[in-house]
């Protein structure tokens, strides 16, 4: 949240996947509809700041993410993901709505077992952190990537 809060509006280096997603999304919504950082995050932070509401990250911290990444992602998985990204850069991502594009992109990436395992571990961490916060907070608004929502809800139940 701190990076989004302090972003100066200047262009920044995107990952290849952000670029592929943005190009595919642009075909549906046009140039003005593609925004990074995502408006859901930046708007939530602005409203939280105005109302003096804490913004708390629930995803893995950098150390946990790095450990999970190195445990789950092999060199072969990285190679396959690179080829997948290259292929999707050429052909785009199927979908008629931004949601379909996001879900189809994530589904393709998660077809690689290491990346699927990494996302499962991220979702588990997010659910654990929400449970921790629910003991401290009366109300919680969680902004979760659409590709993780169903697994996140399942993990909470």
Each model region followed by its residue ranges:
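Compositional signal for N-terminal targeting/processing segments
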Residues: 1-157
């Amino acid at each position: 949240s701190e990076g989004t809060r302090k972003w100066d509006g200047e262009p920044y280096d995107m990952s290849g996947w952000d670029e592929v997603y943005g190009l595919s999304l642009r075909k549906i919504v046009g140039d003005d509809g593609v925004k990074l950082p995502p408006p859901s995050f930046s708007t939530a932070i602005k409203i939280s700041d105005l109302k003096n509401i804490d913004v708390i990250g629930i995803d893995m911290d950098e150390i946990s993410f790095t450990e999970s990444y190195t445990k789950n992602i092999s060199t072969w998985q990285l190679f396959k993901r690179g080829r997948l990204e290259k292929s999707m850069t050429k052909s785009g991502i199927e979908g008629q709505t931004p949601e379909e594009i996001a879900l189809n992109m994530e589904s393709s990436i998660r077809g690689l077992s290491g990346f699927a395992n990494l996302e499962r571990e991220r979702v588990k961490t997010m659910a654990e952190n929400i449970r921790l916060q629910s003991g401290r907070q009366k109300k919680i608004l969680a902004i979760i990537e659409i590709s993780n929502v169903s697994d996140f809800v399942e993990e909470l139940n």
